[in-house]
Every structure is written in structure tokens, then in C-alpha cells.
Design a protein with these regions (language model features):
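Short N-terminal helix/helix-N-cap motif within the alpha/beta-hydrolase-1
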Residues: 95-97
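Internal amphipathic alpha-helical segments of the cytochrome P450 catalytic fold
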Residues: 68, 99-100
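Short catalytic micro-motifs in class I SAM-dependent methyltransferases
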Residues: 89-93
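A conserved beta-strand element that flanks and buttresses the S-adenosyl-L-methionine
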Residues: 86
Length: 177
């Protein structure tokens, strides 16, 4: 089941970010990997923190008013192709079909030579709010992400397991040239 209304309510009213405590996927760490001429598509941008860190960024998020486009990635249409995408906890919900569609759509907005930076919840209902028990977390593993990478002609690198002191997440990068 993929209930976008439930997810939107959860992220608007119950979720609290703690992203900069991560080693590999903190905003400032990733921002340093993005060159000043590159365009970033931030999928599930939340409060859109890359706006103050990256020269050219478009944030997409269905739940948050701070997004440049307040829509799901499936409903987002761009007039340009992007050099880089970030999916920092945003494509974590639903089954193989839902996640596959979301990745297909995100990749369709990228240039042939591009990168994607990922932070993934490996299916754990470990958010601070009890409301997260109703969320259909996707059971991510580095192997599952690798399968999607290969499907889209990306090379997956820098696989890591990281924590922010409270939860464990997976990190990886995709590179395509």
C-alpha cells in the first residue's frame, strides 16, 4: 500500500529532521561534491536546505511548502536535465513497483553523465513518532539499490552504513558517464 496522503501528513506534522548528524549524507558533505555549474534535483527536499548550499537546485517534495515544486517525483515535470540528484530518505516508501516508478522518473530528469547521492532506510520503523508504524517502508539493501543502478546504467560506489546517533541508514552513490 502507498498512501501519499498519510505520508504527506506524517512528514508535515510528525517528522523531525536530524540529517546533518550523518557522516556521508549530511547536506554540507554532499554540497561539497556538487560543482558550482551543476544543477541539482533534490527529490524529497523537505525543508529545502540545499538552497543555501548549492548554486543551482530544484527541490521537489509533496509534503513541504519549502519545496520549489510541491508534488511527488512521479508528478514532477522539468524543462531541463540535471547533473546531480539527491534522494536522502525520500524514496523509501512502498513496494518494488512504487519505488521502481519513482526511480525511473527521477532518472528521466538526469543527463547521461550524472550522479545520484542516496540515503536509505533499510525498512526500519525507527522514527521518533509512533505514526511511523503506519508507513510502508521499503526494505532497502545495498544489493537492491545496486540492481536499480544497473537497470539504469549507473555504477554504484561508496556503499556505507551510517548512523546519526539514533538510527542506522544506508548510503551509496551512483555515477554514470
Amino acid at each position: 500500500m502507498h498512501d501519499q496522503q498519510y505520508l504527506n501528513d506524517y512528514f508535515r506534522n510528525h517528522w523531525k529532521p536530524s540529517l546533518d548528524a550523518y557522516t556521508y549524507s549530511a547536506y554540507d558533505v554532499i554540497a561539497k561534491k556538487i560543482e558550482s555549474h551543476e544543477w541539482l534535483l533534490d527529490v524529497g527536499c523537505g525543508y529545502n536546505p540545499f538552497k543555501s548550499l548549492v548554486s543551482h537546485v530544484v527541490g521537489v517534495d509533496p509534503a513541504m511548502d519549502q519545496a520549489d515544486f510541491q508534488v511527488t517525483i512521479e508528478d514532477f515535470y522539468a524543462t531541463k536535465l540535471f547533473d546531480v540528484a539527491t534522494c536522502l530518505g525520500s524514496l523509501n516508501f512502498g513496494d518494488d513497483a512504487v519505488v521502481g516508478r519513482q526511480i525511473n522518473k527521477m532518472v528521466s530528469h538526469l543527463k547521461t553523465k550524472s550522479r545520484v547521492y542516496w540515503r536509505l532506510n533499510p525498512g526500519r520503523r525507527d522514527h521518533a513518532s509512533e505514526k511511523c508504524q503506519g508507513i510502508p517502508f521499503y526494505p532497502w539493501s545495498h544489493r537492491r539499490l545496486q540492481d536499480f543502478a544497473e537497470l539504469h546504467d549507473f555504477r554504484q560506489v561508496n556503499e556505507q552504513t551510517e548512523t546519526n546517533g539514533r538510527v542506522v541508514r544506508l548510503y551509496a552513490e551512483w555515477h554514470r558517464s
